[in-house]
Swiss-Prot record:
Signal peptide: none annotated. Pathway: Isoprenoid biosynthesis; isopentenyl diphosphate biosynthesis via DXP pathway; isopentenyl diphosphate from 1-deoxy-D-xylulose 5-phosphate: step 5/6. This is 4-hydroxy-3-methylbut-2-en-1-yl diphosphate synthase (flavodoxin). HAMAP family: IspG. GO terms for molecular function: 4 iron, 4 sulfur cluster binding; 4-hydroxy-3-methylbut-2-en-1-yl diphosphate synthase activity (ferredoxin); 4-hydroxy-3-methylbut-2-enyl-diphosphate synthase activity (flavodoxin); iron ion binding.
Length: 375
């Protein structure tokens, strides 16, 4: 029920990864990456499907060998979400997966080889109508750039990116997006800021190698939050040393927090104190798990007492305000006569939320999972 985001998006060109539009005002796409052995087709497909269930828009798959490229052919046949091939060192792998229907090629300028190899990749991408991501990483810059700057700096990442943007420009190839990732928040943020002033191509955001689930989520929220709040970014990936499913959840949580792209429930819950009249923490944890399948955007406030509860409920789709034995229930900001038994609240709230989601879905107020222009 809150107003939409006040953020003005940076203007960019449009590319498509499969049917997913990227840039030029398209919704910011959430990406993740498999961490299985790509040659283990069953495990990789299972992980891709798990990512699809939590709403991923695009999945990147590492293709380190020709054997992995052959496995990718089978993986692609069993996947519906667009797949990006992550290519390092051997440009010929990019040519092979293009034959097998890959939706985007990610190349690392720091190790893909000389310009003649890039020309071959670009020619192949043009033939198959596949976009490319120029993926700059602070940990794998070209040797001459490392020697020039001594260490990764925003200027170093920018120079690497612009060197390869210029190559694609000379080849008259404009179907590409760019990333300038680093594990340091300020290095990444300042690199993206510089790049955003130089080009109008879509930008893929990420704090690379951010860390474990907790620390990596915090780093990513700070770094990507800064950039997104400035209107910078067209796709994102949260890089965690954790289950890739968590990357997708955190990515949507960041977009949801900035009101850039709503998907699923935005829980508003108090941290609790001695005033709470019911188990707020247990209620929120249970509902987050039970309602993971819902993608209907709505704000749900769960507040343990009457200090802030009524005020939050007024701007929530569904709200509950703690009171002794039975708590107040709000829908669309209006207090209802019905009250919730504090001991049975979880089941009651779940039922109310699901019923409300069905109504909103029927009214076409749902944000679709896949960002397909044809939908």
């Amino acid at each position: 029920m809150h107003n939409g985001s006040p953020i003005i998006r940076r203007k960019s060109t449009r590319v498509y990864v499969g049917k997913v539009p990227i840039g030029d005002g398209a919704p910011i796409a959430v990406q993740s990456m498999t961490n299985t052995k790509t040659t283990d087709v069953d495990a990789t497909v299972a992980q891709i499907k798990a990512l699809e269930r939590v709403g991923v828009d695009i999945v990147r798959v590492s293709i380190p060998t020709m054997d992995a490229a052959e496995a990718f052919k089978l993986i692609k046949q069993q996947s519906t979400v667009p797949l990006v091939a992550d290519i390092h060192f051997d440009y010929r792998i990019a040519l092979k997966v293009a034959e097998y229907g890959v939706d985007c090629l990610r190349i690392n300028p720091g190790n893909i080889g000389n310009e003649s190899r890039i020309r071959e990749v670009v020619a192949c991408a043009r033939d198959y109508n596949i976009p490319i991501r120029i993926g700059i990483n602070g940990g794998s810059l070209e040797k001459d750039i490392q020697e020039k700057y001594g260490e990764p700096t925003p200027e170093a990442l920018l120079e690497s990116a612009m060197r390869h943007v210029d190559i694609l420009d000379r080849l008259n190839f404009d179907q590409f997006k760019v990333s300038v990732k680093a594990s340091d928040v300020f290095l990444a943020v300042n690199s993206y800021r510089l790049l955003a002033k130089q080009i109008n191509n879509p930008l893929h955001l990420g704090i690379t190698e951010a860390g474990g689930a907790r620390s990596g989520s915090v780093k990513s929220a700070i770094g990507l939050g800064l950039l997104l709040s400035e209107g910078i970014g067209d796709t994102l990936r949260i890089s965690l040393a954790a289950d890739p499913v968590e990357e997708v959840k955190v990515g949507f949580d960041i977009l949801k927090s900035l009101r850039i792209r709503a998907r699923g429930i935005n829980f508003i819950a108090c941290p609790t104190c001695s005033r709470q009249e019911f188990d707020v923490i247990g209620t929120v944890n249970a509902l987050e798990q039970r309602l993971e399948d819902l993608i209907t955007p709505m704000d749900v406030s769960i507040i343990g007492c009457v200090v802030n509860g009524p005020g939050e409920a007024l701007v929530s789709t569904i709200g509950v305000t703690g009171a002794r034995n039975h708590s107040g229930f709000y829908e669309d900001g209006v207090r209802q006569k019905e009250r919730f038994d504090n001991k049975a609240m979880i089941d009651q709230l779940e039922a109310k939320i699901r019923a409300k989601a069905s109504i909103l879905d029927a009214n076409n107020r749902i944000v679709i999972n896949q960002l397909d222009d044809n939908k």
